[in-house]
């Protein structure tokens, strides 16, 4: 409802040092104790933002994290996944296969890890480091993957990203949502999310 508090992780919840300020932390904890629902929302995977929920004492007082651009919502106090939108496993495999020869780094965030089919030049390791998750490099990922993806994250330099992104768009735009989220990131999500 109108009394609920929603905070995006990137740019609004965190200060320039990528931390929650004491003032913000105290205001949000007070709001939770007063009965307001507080949600931390991010395009990142749920596991990559749970450390923020811990700092806001969601595990004690309650609160939700919304990852993957709303594709997965988790109640931190109970551990329950309330909502989970994925692309089916066949589509997940098709995107992996199609993207393998493109000049772009491919990442699939899942349960505290980032899966990729080859070590990237820069972005895959950087993304894993930022989130504090492990990087799983599996050259035969298309055949080995056993879960449907919540999201694909593709990365490349700003000068080179548009060509492979356009090929992905042309191939999969009818069955997925796609967005260039930064100058160097291109995302593919289940239809209906953005």
Protein language model features and the residues they cover:
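N-terminal G-site helix/loop of the GST-like fold
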Residues: 7, 15
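Conserved ATPase-coupling elements of RecA-like P-loop NTPase cores
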Residues: 16-20
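Active-site phosphate-binding/coordination module
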Residues: 22-123
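Conserved acidic, metal-coordinating active-site core of Asp-based
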Residues: 98, 104-194
């Amino acid at each position: 409802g109108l009394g609920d508090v929603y905070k995006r992780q990137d740019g609004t919840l965190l200060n320039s040092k990528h931390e929650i300020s004491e003032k913000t932390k105290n205001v949000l904890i007070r709001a939770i104790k007063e009965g307001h629902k507080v949600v931390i929302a991010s395009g990142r995977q749920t596991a990559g933002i749970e450390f923020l929920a811990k700092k806001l004492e969601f595990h004690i007082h309650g609160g939700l994290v919304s990852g993957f651009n709303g594709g997965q919502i988790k109640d931190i106090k109970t551990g329950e996944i309330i909502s989970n939108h994925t692309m089916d496993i066949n589509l997940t495999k098709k995107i992996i296969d199609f993207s393998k020869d493109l000049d772009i780094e491919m990442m699939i965030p899942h349960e505290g890890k980032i899966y990729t089919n080859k070590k990237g030049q820069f972005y895959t390791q950087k993304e894993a480091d930022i989130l504090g998750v492990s990087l799983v490099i599996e050259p035969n990922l298309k055949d080995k993957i056993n879960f449907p993806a919540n999201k694909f994250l593709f990365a490349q330099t700003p000068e080179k990203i548009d060509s492979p992104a356009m090929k992905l768009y042309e191939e999969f735009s009818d069955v997925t949502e796609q967005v260039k989220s930064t100058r160097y990131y291109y995302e593919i999500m289940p239809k209906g999310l953005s």
